[in-house]
Amino acid sequence: MTMTDPIADMLTRLRNANQAYHDRVTMPYSKIKANIAEVLKSEGYISTWLVEEPEESAVGKRLVVELKYGQSRERSLAGIKRVSKPGLRVYAKSGELPRVLGGLGVAIISTSQGLLTDRQARKRSVGGEVLAFVW
């Protein structure tokens, strides 16, 4: 069965695992998901991520994301929201890039220079597709 929106699936898996205080979450691998995981890691929302090669019975590669919690299990990932969807794409020019919670959160932008945060895209003066908000 094909998935209509694999990015939304990834974000939902992360949100659900975070709400249930799971230490790790696995999902089907793709390059865009690995790039999103790298952005989340660089911004401090997750501990680490890795790619598991398939076993003999498995179908394809898996992306494993290690979630990050504070000293008394406070969530570092308070919220995550998909913005641009397959049915309604959302694009923003460099001067119109959204700020998430007044700069406390991060918008993940798909640009011609790869996936960037809203701050990085503003600094490089590039716009693109607004994939998600994370706070």
Curated annotation (Swiss-Prot):
GO molecular function terms listed in the Swiss-Prot or TrEMBL record: rRNA binding; structural constituent of ribosome
Disulfide cross-links: none
Keyword 4Fe-4S among UniProt keywords: no
SUPFAM superfamilies the record matches: Ribosomal protein S8
Domain of life: Bacteria
A Pfam family recorded for this sequence: Ribosomal_S8
Alphabetic keyword roster: Ribonucleoprotein, Ribosomal protein, RNA-binding, rRNA-binding
Subunit composition and interactions: Part of the 30S ribosomal subunit. Contacts proteins S5 and S12.
Protein name: Small ribosomal subunit protein uS8
